[in-house]
Structures are given as C-alpha cells and as structure tokens.
C-alpha cells in the first residue's frame, strides 16, 4: 500500500498544527545542523502547516528568503494564514519544476522523506535546484529504528490480538517499506549528492492522554495511520489504542518517543 494524500482533512491539519511540537523541535535541530544562516535562500519541502518555515525565515532574515511547499492543500492553507509574508505553494518533492536550477543555498526535508514515493526522483530534483556547495537536510524514519519507538511498542501488542490480528495486514502500512539507513545512504550517493553528516536522533513529547496520542499519530500521517484497518474496526481500534497509551501515563503525561536519522548532504 502506497502513501495516499487523499485522506487528509482540515481537522487532521489543525490537529497536526497543534500537536507537532516534536517535529518542530527536530526540524530546528536539523536547520542548525545544516548551518543555514542569514542571507540564505531556502526551500522547505514538505513544510506542512509552516511552523518550521516561519522559523527558518526569521533565521535567514530580510537578506534571505524561504519558500515552503507541501502536497496537502489543507496544511498549506494554515501555513498561508500563519505567515502571510512567506511564499507557500502546493507541490511535491518529486517535481520542483517551479524552481530554477541552482536557485537555493539549502533544501530542508524535515520529517517528510519517509513519505516520499519516488525518493531517487526527489533527490535528483533537489540536486538540480541546489547551488554548488548547497546543502540538503533530512530527518527520516529508517526501517530498522521504527520498532524502538513508543508508537510501535504500544500498537504492536494491540494489533496482535483478536479481532485485529485476523483482519489487519501490517505489511500494508505505507511505512512498512521504509528504507533502512544503509539504503538511504546508497540512494543519496547514487543521486550524486555527497553525504556530509549522519546521526541518530531522538524526538520526544508528552501527551495529555491516549486519545491525544492517537490524534497525533493519525494527523502526522495525514490519515494513513489506520488505512490498512478495515473500516468497521477503526472506531474500536482507536479506543483500544488510546487505552493502551493511557496505561503508559505518568505524572507529566504520556511520553511518546521515536528514533530516526538526520543527515546533511551537499551538492559538489
């Protein structure tokens, strides 16, 4: 099952904007790792509701510029309201034809690369729009680290029991075919980019209750989280997952952590 863009909604977009602190903080660390500075021209691919894009705009200052693109119309609508002075457009990583060759100092893809269907094509487009010496920064979820996160640890046992075990094909989830770190490195190098830095990252956020965790995961996946679940089971699964997350609740809420990779590549 491939990633679908058709299941997003204004409710999911608004929920994501409200609950996406961990992605926002991870994105800021990525921008710092990329050494984006005043005067840079930056393309934020998969900008979502524009929180990171707005922060980048403040970092590059009036002498620089930033453009945000995202394939999800509802999220671009929120971004345009958030920062009217920034250019936000509906667009996908695989097609950056709206931008001239060698027109950006940096391209940022924070928490989006794992959702991109054609990664080699996207990287080729990124390389085309980067100036010589320009940087690509990516945070992503490699397949071998997904099992270390809270969501997988909680969802696995719930989906492994009846009635879900008999009717839910976990291999159909879009992220089940994520690239491994080794495959990510190979794909980047094959694109002609030079890998400069790669590190393991941890993101963490406390949620008030189990329902909020389910909302967070569903909005972060723009409706893809439960796509592989038969429709007649989704309501009960949401309840069961919320209860399982609630069992992890401590004095400060429910800690939700995930582990991924952050890397910077350069166009030589």
Which stretches of residues belong to each language-model region?
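Class I SAM-dependent methyltransferase SAM/SAH-binding core
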Residues: 43-45, 49-96
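A short acidic, Gly/Pro-enriched loop at the edge of an enzyme's catalytic core
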Residues: 97-107
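Conserved catalytic/acceptor-binding region of the Class I
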Residues: 120, 135-208
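A short SAM/SAH-binding and catalytic strip from SAM-dependent methyltransferases
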Residues: 106-119, 142
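Short glycine-dipeptide loop
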Residues: 62-63, 130-135
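Conserved class I S-adenosyl-L-methionine
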Residues: 1-40, 51-55, 75-78, 92
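Short, conserved SAM-binding segment of the class I
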Residues: 121-125
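Conserved Class I S-adenosyl-L-methionine
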Residues: 5, 22-23, 49-51, 173-268
């Amino acid at each position: 099952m491939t990633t679908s863009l058709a299941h997003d909604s204004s409710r999911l977009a608004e929920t994501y904007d409200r609950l996406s602190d961990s992605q926002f903080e991870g994105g800021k660390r990525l921008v710092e790792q990329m050494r984006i500075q005043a005067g840079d021209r930056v393309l934020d691919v998969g900008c979502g509701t524009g929180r990171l894009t707005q922060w980048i705009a403040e970092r590059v200052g009036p002498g620089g510029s930033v453009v945000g693109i995202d394939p999800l119309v509802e999220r671009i609508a929120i971004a345009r309201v958030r920062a009217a002075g920034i250019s936000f457009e509906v667009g996908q990583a695989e097609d950056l034809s709206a931008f001239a060759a060698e027109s950006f100092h940096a391209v940022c893809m924070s928490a989006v690369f794992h959702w991109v269907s054609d990664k080699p094509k996207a990287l080729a487009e990124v390389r085309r729009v980067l100036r010589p010496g320009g940087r690509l920064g990516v945070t992503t979820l490699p397949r071998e680290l997904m099992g270390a996160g809270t969501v997988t640890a909680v969802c696995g046992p719930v989906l492994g029991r009846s009635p879900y075990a008999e009717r839910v094909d976990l291999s159909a989830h879009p992220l089940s075919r994520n690239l491994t770190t080794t495959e990510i490195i190979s794909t980047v190098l094959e694109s002609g980019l030079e890998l400069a830095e790669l590190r393991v990252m941890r993101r963490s956020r406390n949620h008030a209750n189990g329902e909020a965790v389910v909302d967070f995961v569903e909005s972060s996946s723009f409706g893809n989280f439960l796509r592989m679940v038969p429709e007649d089971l989704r309501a009960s699964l949401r309840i069961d997952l919320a209860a399982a997350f609630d069992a992890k609740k401590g004095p400060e809420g429910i800690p939700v952590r995930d582990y991924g990779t952050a890397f910077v590549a350069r166009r030589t």
